[in-house]
Every structure is written in structure tokens, then in C-alpha cells.
Amino acid sequence: MVAATAEFRRVFSAFDRDADGKISAAELRLCMKAALGEDMSAEEAEALVSSADTDDDGLLDEEEFTKLAVQLEMGDEEERCRGLMEAFRMYEMEGEGRITPASLKRMLSKLGSHQGIEECQTMICRFDLDGDGVISFEEFKIMMDA
């Protein structure tokens, strides 16, 4: 978290264009466009600032900005996990919470890639960290990050 806090501090300084120790909705809009290429309406920027503005001054200080950034980052991670879970469920069989060589073979066949059980076992072995012959959701997440 220390590294993340240092990163948020660096981002805060970059967003604080006039170096007044506060980020306005206008500064937030400009920097979102420059940093991420995302267009943000004035209303969206105001709403985002307002959601994290604990002292009601219409601006974000470094602490408010950091809390907002952490919340947004957590939201992105939750969304990513939901997407991964949807993908995982496509490959698992019978709702057992694991991908077996047979369930992998079945899904790959549906996708037009016809692999034998042996090839599917080999694919699973690469990410089967606990050696149980199947891929758990945790192992699936690691595999998708590789």
C-alpha cells in the first residue's frame, strides 16, 4: 500500500495543475483526458469530486483524492473479478468450481479448437499450482494474468 500511496501522490501532483494542493473538477477532466484519453463531462467530473469531497469545498485535497483513487481501483478489480468469474463458469463443468480436462476439452470444442484430453491435461498442468489435476478459480485468475 505504501507504493500505491506514493503513486497516488505522484498522480495527485500531476493532476494539480495550479499547484494549490487541491484538484478541481476542471483539473480532473483535463488530466483524465491527457492521462487516459477519456472524455469526462463537466457533470461527471463534478459528481466524482462531490462523491469524495468530505469538507464540501468543491475540491479534492490529497487525502480525498487518494481515497477516491482507492475506491475506483477497488471497483475496477471487482469488475475484473466478475468478468473472470463469468469466463471461468464457461469452462467449468457441473458447477463444481473447477476446470477439468474434460470441461476444458468441451469448451474448446465449442470454440472450434478440437484438442484431445491429453492436450487439455497438459494445458491444465501449466497452471495447476496445487497439483490436484484441475484449475480452481484462484489458479484461473493467475493464469489469466500470465
Curated annotation (Swiss-Prot):
Coiled-coil region(s): none
Residue numbers binding Ca(2+) 1: 16, 18, 20, 22, 27
Binding site for Ca(2+) 3: 128, 130, 132, 139
Domain EF-hand: 3-38, 40-75, 79-114, 115-146
Entry GO CC: cytoplasm
Gene3D superfamilies in the cross-refs: EF-hand
KW Metal-binding (keyword) present: yes
Highest taxon of source: Eukaryota
Entry keyword annotation includes Iron-sulfur: no
One Pfam match: EF-hand_7
Function summary: Potential calcium sensor.
Protein name in the entry: Putative calcium-binding protein CML19
Organismal lineage: Eukaryota, Viridiplantae, Streptophyta, Embryophyta, Tracheophyta
Gene name of this polypeptide: CML19
